[in-house]
Curated annotation (Swiss-Prot):
UniProt PTM comment: O-GlcNAcylation at Thr-305 and Thr-312 inhibits activating phosphorylation at Thr-308 via disrupting the interaction between AKT1 and PDPK1. O-GlcNAcylation at Ser-473 also probably interferes with phosphorylation at this site. Phosphorylation on Thr-308, Ser-473 and Tyr-474 is required for full activity. Phosphorylation of the activation loop at Thr-308 by PDPK1/PDK1 is a prerequisite for full activation. Phosphorylation by mTORC2 in response to growth factors plays a key role in AKT1 activation: mTORC2 phosphorylates different sites depending on the context, such as Thr-450, Ser-473, Ser-477 or Thr-479, thereby facilitating subsequent phosphorylation of the activation loop by PDPK1/PDK1. Phosphorylation at Ser-473 by mTORC2 promotes ubiquitination and degradation by the proteasome.
Domain PH: residue ranges: 5-108
GO biological process: activation-induced cell death of T cells; apoptotic mitochondrial changes; behavioral response to pain; cell migration involved in sprouting angiogenesis; cell projection organization; cellular response to decreased oxygen levels; cellular response to epidermal growth factor stimulus; cellular response to granulocyte macrophage colony-stimulating factor stimulus
Keywords: Acetylation, Apoptosis, ATP-binding, Carbohydrate metabolism, Cell membrane, Cytoplasm, Developmental protein, Disulfide bond, Glucose metabolism, Glycogen biosynthesis, Glycogen metabolism, Glycoprotein, Isopeptide bond, Kinase, Membrane, Mitochondrion, Neurogenesis, Nucleotide-binding, Nucleus, Phosphoprotein, Serine/threonine-protein kinase, Sugar transport, Transferase, Translation regulation, Transport, Ubl conjugation
Native source organism of the sequence: Mus musculus (Mouse)
Lineage: Eukaryota, Metazoa, Chordata, Craniata, Vertebrata
Active site: 274
GO molecular function per UniProt: 14-3-3 protein binding; ATP binding; calmodulin binding; kinase activity; nitric-oxide synthase regulator activity; phosphatidylinositol-3,4,5-trisphosphate binding; phosphatidylinositol-3,4-bisphosphate binding; potassium channel activator activity
Coarse class of the protein's main subcellular location: cytoplasm
InterPro entries for the chain: AGC-kinase_C, Akt1, Kinase-like_dom_sf, PH-like_dom_sf, PH_domain, PH_PKB, Pkinase_C, Prot_kinase_dom
Deletion consequences: Show fetal growth impairment and reduced vascularization in the placenta; majority of pups died within 10 days.
The protein's name: RAC-alpha serine/threonine-protein kinase
Catalysis performed (reactions): L-seryl-[protein] + ATP = O-phospho-L-seryl-[protein] + ADP + H(+); L-threonyl-[protein] + ATP = O-phospho-L-threonyl-[protein] + ADP + H(+)
Amino acid sequence: MNDVAIVKEGWLHKRGEYIKTWRPRYFLLKNDGTFIGYKERPQDVDQRESPLNNFSVAQCQLMKTERPRPNTFIIRCLQWTTVIERTFHVETPEEREEWATAIQTVADGLKRQEEETMDFRSGSPSDNSGAEEMEVSLAKPKHRVTMNEFEYLKLLGKGTFGKVILVKEKATGRYYAMKILKKEVIVAKDEVAHTLTENRVLQNSRHPFLTALKYSFQTHDRLCFVMEYANGGELFFHLSRERVFSEDRARFYGAEIVSALDYLHSEKNVVYRDLKLENLMLDKDGHIKITDFGLCKEGIKDGATMKTFCGTPEYLAPEVLEDNDYGRAVDWWGLGVVMYEMMCGRLPFYNQDHEKLFELILMEEIRFPRTLGPEAKSLLSGLLKKDPTQRLGGGSEDAKEIMQHRFFANIVWQDVYEKKLSPPFKPQVTSETDTRYFDEEFTAQMITITPPDQDDSMECVDSERRPHFPQFSYSASGTA
């Protein structure tokens, strides 16, 4: 492999993801897709070791806009099934053009490299046999899945790029979450985006505590991901009913979450980013399922004040608020917050006023109820360290650090993965179609949410109309 070289460097203004202020950053773009930003221009190798921002432009889509400031450009990527955006601006159109060209050139180069590797792997340089084989090995669907095969029950979430709907598969009576993304968001009008590599990542992901992808398909203007929807209820629901969990019960859930995050970090090189109580569900046996129904929240209006905020602020790690680089350690902060909630019955930092809340997250020392045991205190203190490099799990060992903590001393991690531990609570459901933990308002009566556009029922769009998205239909093998 060639040495990694800097393709372009210079000052950019980067817009904060959560606190929407513009911050000057000195960015380096490298030919391996790394795009890293610093507060000051790095003078030596040591300074280069610790960037504030660390992104990749691989498989990104680039957009230029004159709002909220002139000469703005946005880098958009699909991570997992969630659309992520980074916003920058420069002083002149020429400068923006230079950055855009450099970023596009690097992204295209990486795409070519990946295609060559794919061809090499499938042993055929010219055709799509690699992709075909992949579909076959995943039990190629006997028919194309369409939107008409589901009943639409409830809107679970809505965002800038699409929506998530609770659906029931007519043929089986099983419940799924269908995530529907607008195609135009992901594919630039005049270029083919490199979107579906992520789809492949999802398809190949198998972990007992992660929501599995059951189907993915497309209509003429949407991409649809159909994912498991565990029916043992949200952990949030069970915790609010019981107010607090015992340390043993929290340990069980914590261990399953650690197992799933370890898999994402080490096997998939993905940071989950969105760990919070609402994203944790129980399956019918009482095991954890981490959902992937996340959507970017509605974007703020152009020209809104700097104080505008987007997202769930209570769970944000200090480094995210400061818009510094956040790597895997951000997930361990999230684990700290949800485990604190489970064992203490409240959030570690809370204030209705966002400004005050941010200050607490950044400055306030963590406090514990007197009833909490020393191991639990030690674990939570480690996970909720403000500095991600000092945080438990923040080092190179990642999840292994947490697994070795004395709070988890009696846990056999292979047994966790193999679901050999007995869940401390078994939901009172009789089958996968039992809806007792769903909101009564939508299980009592059949609500029909029409698919996003009436004409979405025109599934069988001929393939010429979807040149951007070859090989998008997917069906998981075996039972869900």
